[in-house]
UniProtKB/Swiss-Prot annotation:
GO annotation terms (biological process): feeding behavior; neuropeptide signaling pathway
Subcellular location: Secreted
Residues modified to Tyrosine amide: Y63
Keywords per UniProt: Amidation, Cleavage on pair of basic residues, Hormone, Neuropeptide, Secreted, Signal
Name used for this protein in its record: Peptide YY-like
Annotated source species: Lampetra fluviatilis
Encoding gene (name): pyy
Lineage: Eukaryota, Metazoa, Chordata, Craniata, Vertebrata
């Protein structure tokens, strides 16, 4: 027979997995709804603007660590990795 502690751990793990999957599903904005063939020009204009906005959100450029190439990971300069904080700057004092 399975102990209550194991059951509780399995339940906690499954709840965490469900929550993580739920968070991942909402990572992208929802696609705009097509107004159909009988839509008025105003509805079509709103739909096209919503599609443009959706495409701009989905295809926006991401900067930072994603822009690094494998060569930069291997052959990076250690001096560039030095982190400076605002209070450590001697010009402030």
């Amino acid at each position: 027979m399975v102990s209550p502690r194991v059951r509780l751990a399995a339940l906690a793990l499954s709840v965490c997995a469900i929550l993580c999957l739920g968070m991942h599903a909402s990572a992208f904005p929802p696609k705009p709804d097509n107004p159909g063939d009988n839509a008025s020009p105003e509805q079509m204009a709103r739909y096209k603007a919503a599609v443009r906005h959706y495409i701009n959100l989905i295809t926006r450029q991401r900067y930072g660590k994603r822009a690094l190439t494998p060569e930069n990971w291997i052959y990076r300069d250690p001096a560039e990795e030095r982190v400076t904080y605002g209070l450590d700057d001697y010009a402030m004092w």
